[in-house]
Amino acid sequence: MTAPIPVVVAGALGRMGAEVIKAVVGAEDCSLVGAIDNTPGKEGADVGLELGLGELEVAVTADFEGCLCAVSQSVRDSGSGAVLVDFTHPSVVYEHTRAAIAYGVHPVIGTTGLSPEQLNDLTEFSAKASVGGAVIPNFSVGMVLLQQAAAAAARFYDHAELTELHHNRKADAPSGTCIKTAELMEELGKSFNPEEVDEHESLAGCRGGQRDSGLRLHSVRLPGLVAHQEVMFGAPGETYTLRHDTIDRSAYMPGVLLTVRKVGNLGSLVYGLERLI
């Protein structure tokens, strides 16, 4: 019988981290071996008790590198490869990903905010270290289908705008998912939204951010939202709208577990769930 995949979760007490831990604990082929979180007063607490899952005998720690070092040594002795699932903050995600690779732990990064330059650097670093990893802007299979549909529709429409809507505690804008959708639409190499009038904004930024391709991206942040995205295409006499709504974070868990199971077979860092399905 194959040994379960050792999994460390960073951001363990956050909303996404908690969902990941529930999914990992419920998966027969995975084993929770680390829980990293810097919430004050939680150091040393049993993460299972904190999340209402019962005792899991995995203590919460704020020592990111210390945890990775210990797990790396443990799996090296056992011959299996560990995985880090990171849902933390854009300000630390680059350092977290690089540290995981350095310790030989496969990073599965759900935290958005990495720049193209940082992604390139991490991809090169992971390839040199022969440590597979994945940066996934959105773990929803439904969102991958929307992105593929948007890329196909972009062949036929010259006018398009993207709107992403998230809860008001999301730090980065636009979302990594929205940027990824735009990038897929731009692979055709065409320009969008040719100017037909001399526009003037009476309120700066009200028309959204515009990429070099001409695509416009809009961000909405409100309490009550989870994660939502709309791509609207326009042509004379018609509009075509694609929309995906995440109602509950449990929707991401099949994609998270899929990535955890596949990342150990990769030779370097990949970007996007579509690379794995």
Curated annotation (Swiss-Prot):
Q: Name one GO molecular function term.
A: 4-hydroxy-tetrahydrodipicolinate reductase
Under PROSITE patterns, the record lists: DAPB (PS01298)
Predominantly, its location class is cytoplasm
Q: What is its EC number?
A: 1.17.1.8
- Cellular component per GO? cytosol
* Record-linked InterPro entries: DapB_C, DapB_N, DapB_N_CS, DHDPR_bac, NAD(P)-bd_dom_sf
KW Transcription (keyword) present: no
Active site (catalytic residues): H166, K170
GO annotation (BP), single = lysine biosynthetic process via diaminopimelate
Q: Would the keyword NAD be found if you checked this record's keyword annotation? A: yes
Question: Where are the coiled-coil regions?
Answer: none
Q: What is this protein called?
A: 4-hydroxy-tetrahydrodipicolinate reductase
Organism annotation: Synechococcus sp. (strain CC9605)
The gene from which this protein is expressed is dapB
